[in-house]
């Protein structure tokens, strides 16, 4: 939680620390403690590491289920790297927490 109160830098943190921080945001800050700035924090993370990118996609897929309106703009505005964008859509479509109508919309947002 202290990372949210201080100038935590994802850039200087190790892979495990980054993944752990994203998971904490996903678990504790997508419902009653939600703030759209957390979406922006995660979207700014740039990495070539598979597990970091998978964690980012998992975070955004979960965010779609819990904060649809705030999260959808990251896909419609193409604010995520291509791989993360498409993996987010894949994971969200696999979720039981997303409606069929939402899944159809997400399918149309896939990028090539």
Q: What is each PLM-predicted segment?
A:
Residues 1-112:
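Alpha-helical scaffold domains
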């Amino acid at each position: 939680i202290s990372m949210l109160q201080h100038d935590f830098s994802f850039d200087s943190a190790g892979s495990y620390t980054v993944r752990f921080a994203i998971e904490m945001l996903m678990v504790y800050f997508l419902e009653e403690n939600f703030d759209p700035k957390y979406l922006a924090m995660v979207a700014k993370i740039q990495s070539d590491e598979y597990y970091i990118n998978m964690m980012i996609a998992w975070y955004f897929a979960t965010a779609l289920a819990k904060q649809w309106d705030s999260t959808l703009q990251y896909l419609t505005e193409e604010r995520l790297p291509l791989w993360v964008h498409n993996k987010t859509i894949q994971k969200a479509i696999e979720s039981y927490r997303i409606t069929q109508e939402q899944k159809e919309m997400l399918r149309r947002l896939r990028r090539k």
